[in-house]
Amino acid sequence: MRNVKSFHIPHSSLLIQTSMFIEQPAKWLRWLYPKALWRMDPNDRSVYLTFDDGPIPEATPYILDVLAQYGVKATFFMVGDNVRKYPEIYQRVVNEGHRIGNHTHNHIGGFRHTIKEYSYNIEKANAYLHTDLVRPPHGWMRLSQYAWLSRKFRIVMWDLVTRDYSKWMTADDVLDNVKRFARNGSIITFHDSLKSIEKLRTALPASIGWLQQQGYQFKVFE
């Protein structure tokens, strides 16, 4: 009989895998961060579109054009250093009535940084963003970081991540995720990034059109 090796999977690794690779976060993950917003009113026929990682000139202006075409407002969780590089795109997002959220200054994952490093990076971003909303990149937060964020911000996670960033996904796959998992109160995550934009050129207008056909209203966080 061959020796069977056992492997220990750290809790943090399990959390990373769960937060990155499923479209709808598990109940236990939502329970772990109860003060975070995962889903809005389940009795309201509304969804909340969110976009992470911008602003960048290759993606954000196109997304804004699509949103304007459909008369939809969204929330953009921005990387502070991208706002520093492209302040005119940030200003366009604001001028067109969209909501801004903090996505750290350098898109850092919480598990790789101390609370001091993490909080500094968040505050550095907020010097550009001036917002009370925050979304941790990849959903990664140590419990100490979660506690700190909860005192200073409204933490916005997601009810549906479209996985538009994945090289294994097509535009049709992204649209299919929206059709399969969107529901009342869903916070839906797309990305204004180089990894996602080619898929979004097809998937974003198709997703918005389908959601409108299903009777959903589009809201931003108050």
Which residues does each predicted region cover?
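CE4/NodB-like, metal-dependent polysaccharide N-deacetylase domain
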Residues: L64-K73, H98-R99, H105-I108, I115-L143, ...
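A short, conserved beta-to-alpha structural element at the edge of catalytic cores
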Residues: Q69-E96
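Acidic-and-aromatic substrate-binding clefts and catalytic sites of carbohydrate-active enzymes
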Residues: G54-E58, F77-Y86, I108-K116, R135-R142, ...
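His/Asp/Glu-enriched short active-site or ligand-binding loop at hydrolase and phosphoryl-transfer sites
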Residues: W140, Q145-K179, G215-E222
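Alpha-helical membrane-targeting segments
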Residues: Q17-L37, F111-R112, K116, M141-A147, ...
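Intrinsically disordered, low-complexity proline-rich regions
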Residues: M1-K5, P10-S12, Q17-T18, N126
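A cross-domain feature marking catalytic cores of carbohydrate-active enzymes
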Residues: F51-D53, M78-G80, N102-T104, P136-H138, ...
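N-terminal pre-catalytic segment of deacetylase/amide-hydrolase enzymes
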Residues: S6, L15-T50, P55-Q69, K85-E88, ...
